[in-house]
Every structure is written in C-alpha cells, then in structure tokens.
Amino acid sequence: MIDSAWKSWYRARHDQRCIASGDAFEDYATALLARLHSDYLNPAPMGKHGDGGCDGLADNGSILYACYGQRATTGVDQKTKDKLESDFARGLACWNGFSTWRFVTNALFGPLPTKSVLALRQQHASGTQRPITIEIWQVDDLWWKAADKLTPAQLDEVIPGVPHAENVELADLVELILSLEDVDGDGPDHIESIRPVPSTKMDFNNLPETTRAEFNAGRLLSARIDKWFSEQADPALRDEKAQRFRVIYQEARQATRDVREIVRRVYGALGGQDFDLSTKRANAVYAVTAYFFDSCDIFEEPPADNAGGEVRHVTTY
C-alpha cells in the first residue's frame, strides 16, 4: 500500500498535471479514467462527427465522459461554456445509451458555464423525456473520484514515481526492499540477531548523528536481510551486490567529501531519490545500507589500533 507521504507526493504530481492545457490535460484525465473503469472505451475521431463529443464510455455505455483541457487565455468563461454545450449536444446526438454525463475539466467554472449546467439539468431532470445526470468534475473531483481510487500499480502507470532502485545493478534488491516494508515490527525476527553497533567504524568515517540513528534503526532488520539472501537461488548474489555497493560508494566519494552527501547517494542508488517520502521505504533502505556497512562492504575500515575514532577519514566539510 502507498502510505500517506506517498499519497501526498502523488497528489502534488496530479495538481501539476492538471495545470497543463489542451491535449496534455485531456490525455492525463483519460489515462486515469481508462484505469478507473474496466470497460472504458474511448472512440477515435472519425469523419465529420469526430469522436461524437465522447472522450470515454463506461459502465456498459451508461456513463459518457467529455474532457476539456483549458486552452483559452482570453474569454475563458465563454469558451468553457461553448465547449460544455457543444460536447453535450454532440454526445446527445451520437450516443443514445448514456444516463450520466461527466464533463471533466481543469477550466475555472464562472457564471456562464454554471448557468449552462443548471439549464441542462432542468432540461434533463428526472421525469423528462431524456433524464440525464449531469456532473462536473474539476481537479479535486478527478483526484478523489478517479486517481484516489486506483491501485498503486495503476497510479504509477499514469504518474511514474513509486520508489525503485535508481541504479540498475541494484534493481534485483527491490524485492528485498519490499519484503522489509512488510515487517510490522511485532515479529520475533524484529528483535533477534541484531548486529552490535560498530561505533569505531562510524567514528572513523565521521558519520553524523542522523545517519547513525538511521543505521541503528535499520540494524533491527538485519536478520530479515540474512534470511532473504539465504533464500535466493544465486548463492553469490550477496557478494555481487556488496561489490556493487562498494563501487557506488567509491563513485560518491569521488564526487563529494561531505559524508552526508555520500550516504544520500548510496540511499538514492538503492531506493530512488525520493525514497524518504515513504517511511517504510526509508527504513528498508536504511536497513540494507547498514547491513552492507556493518559487513565492511562500504565506507572505510579503521586501522586495527584505532581505539576511539580520533582519525576522521571522511570529512563533513
């Protein structure tokens, strides 16, 4: 499931998509509707009738959608009114089976289109010759009534951005990340086999307190990670990923001397740059990074005679 932080991220991207004008907004809206309805049909424009004022039919033809991405910069209210009336008239003439008409738009609704909607509702009220429910879906409606109803996979098809391994050579660890996200915190493996905190190595690499806290939280899942690697068909997978982590760390060190930036680059390679918008995803990324930190695969090992981290191998300046 997408947690509240990721839902906020998707909502922000939705609002950005809805700023687009013309076809860009209409394509976005129909992409959502096509996933909202399993029987959604969007006829291609043909001949003099075009698409018949139809941007989608759903629920066995009982719902007809018309989408309008605002194009006008002057006379906006009049043009929205004209578009609404034109699409409704064309839909009424071409499609005789619908009982609900939805006008999906990112245009502001001023007095003129509002009056048109009221007039059409009176003309097609219950008890008239052709009763039709007339609905206006604006940006908020499109979110709550369509986007918010989709599964995470469907939503990611329309608005790509669900966290993933940014580095292609770590992509097969996505399954591990997802398995760690499912940990509820109550299972026995959540408290067993916790690795001792290697404070000397953390001191030697001058890890900031925030990173230490992240690593310490991640270590609670180390037994899960051991178990996951032991269950993989390729016994060399763990060593292969350890080598890749080492390369990513070394590349980060070549780009910056700030240990916080280095850690962030390692996190991003594993979970994507926006990994921390999801609390569970962030904890899983911390866990895997701490796992390879503790097993000496990333960052530098202090000399054998280093007692307390007086030497600072990586600076934060």
Explain the meaning of each model-derived region.
Residues 2-44:
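Acidic-basic catalytic patches of nuclease active cores, encompassing PD-(D/E)XK
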Residues 1-6, 235-239, 259:
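Short, compositionally biased low-complexity segments
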Residues 33, 124, 263-266:
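Broad structural signal for hydrophobic residues in well-ordered alpha-helices, predominantly aliphatic
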Residues 247-255, 261-265:
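C-terminal accessory/interaction regions of large nucleic acid-associated machines
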Residues 89-251:
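Acidic metal-coordinating catalytic centers involved in nucleic-acid phosphodiester chemistry
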Residues 26-30, 34-89:
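Catalytic centers of nucleases
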Residues 260-317:
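Charge-dense, extended regions
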